[in-house]
């Protein structure tokens, strides 16, 4: 009886591991979501899409889950200090949600070797475990956009090349915030006060 249970356990473990192996045709891309209408989504959003038709996988990992109903949410958001976590959803649900919100979705497929795709996917799966999900959000240095860069660098050993756009012009954090909050002057004022000299 013990041998059968052990064999069954090994078989189940193998199937879970096998199901997590990406096929050679799998693609990993970065999704960039345009601005939303409220303060907490005024700066857009980012996520990793894992699309593997051969394995019937089409999911999005993102680092933008937060406790919206937490007391003092907007004050903590304006201060740039909240507990955030990684989440995962089907691409279909993510796409439908942002289309419903009338927000743009841009996709950039990453030029990765098979081993790099698997390493990045494995990192995301491990990061999604309950004990690894949460992180302390920082308005400028640790958010859904910086996590894309940091996760890619960590999972792939700093082998990704980031190209600076030709039209890049250095700007202060304050200028960048104001560019995104012109329609919400109270939000802009609140962030200015909460962050003060940091920006």
Predicted regions and their residues:
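Extracellular structured ligand-interaction cores
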Residues: 27, 45, 58, 107-109, ...
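Bacterial Sec-dependent N-terminal signal peptides
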Residues: 1-21
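Generic structural hydrophobic/aromatic packing signal, biased to beta-strands
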Residues: 30, 48-50, 61, 108-112, ...
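A cross-kingdom signal targeting lumenal/periplasmic-facing segments of multi-pass membrane
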Residues: 67-158
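Glycine-rich catalytic cores of cysteine/serine-nucleophile enzymes that process amide/ester linkages
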Residues: 23-102
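Activation targets extended, charge/polar-rich intrinsically disordered C-terminal tails
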Residues: 126-199
């Amino acid at each position: 009886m013990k041998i059968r249970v052990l064999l069954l356990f090994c078989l189940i473990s193998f199937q879970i591991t096998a199901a997590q192996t990406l096929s050679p045709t799998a693609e990993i891309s970065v999704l960039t979501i345009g601005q939303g209408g409220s303060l907490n989504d005024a700066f857009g959003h980012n996520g990793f899409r894992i699309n593997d038709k051969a394995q019937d996988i089409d999911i999005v990992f993102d680092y933008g889950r937060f406790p919206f109903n937490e007391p003092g949410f907007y004050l903590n958001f304006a201060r740039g200090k909240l507990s955030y976590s990684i989440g995962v959803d089907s691409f279909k649900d993510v796409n439908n949600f942002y289309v419903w919100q009338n927000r743009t979705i841009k996709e950039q497929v990453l030029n990765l070797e098979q081993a790099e795709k698997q390493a990045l996917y494995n990192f995301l799966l491990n990061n999604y475990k309950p004990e690894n999900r949460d992180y302390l959000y920082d308005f400028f240095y640790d958010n859904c956009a910086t996590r894309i860069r940091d996760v890619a660098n960590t999972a792939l050993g700093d082998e990704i090349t980031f190209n600076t756009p030709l039209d890049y012009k250095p700007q202060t954090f304050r200028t960048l915030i104001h560019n995104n909050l012109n329609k919400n002057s109270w939000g802009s004022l609140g962030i200015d006060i909460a962050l003060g000299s940091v920006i």
